[in-house]
Every structure is written in structure tokens, then in C-alpha cells.
């Protein structure tokens, strides 16, 4: 992903307990992020912490991917916590598209 990153944290059993991504979270990087999330979905532990930080930009394509990932985690009964590092403009963006409460949740 150009100007974006994706990291996984695993436990001793090789199950993913944490995901972190950030940078340019825009359409140009959405296919690679989708690939990473699809691969990660098969190896998630029972609880996962998802940290989204160092966001340079974020657009609706990434929001849609995150919502799809949330739906997948719900389907496979994975508990999750989101940690967001948002500036005021990014918080306003999420509020304006109607997703702020969903993203700041712990399930």
C-alpha cells in the first residue's frame, strides 16, 4: 500500500490479537487493505484490538471496508475494540457520514 501500512500482532498460537493500520487510507490503497483484512479474518483470535492511527487521509472506500470487516467479525463471533487516532476534521467526517458511533465502539 502506497503511503499506508498494515500490521498484525499475534499470540503464541499464531492467532491475530491486534491489527494496526494508518497513513493514506484512500481508494488507491483500498484493494490492498481489503486483501489484508480478508486474509486476517481467517486467523483472528476471540478478541481483537484494531488501532487506526497516523491517518493522513481517509475516504468512504476505507469506511466501507471497515464496516464489512466489522460485519465479518460479528458473523464469526469475534469481540473487537477500535482505537482511533483522529484529528478534529476526521472526527467531523465520520460524524457527517453517520458512522461515528459505530466506529468508536467496543463489541
Q: Which residues does each predicted region cover?
A:
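STAS-like cytosolic regulatory interaction modules
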Residues: 1-61, 67-107
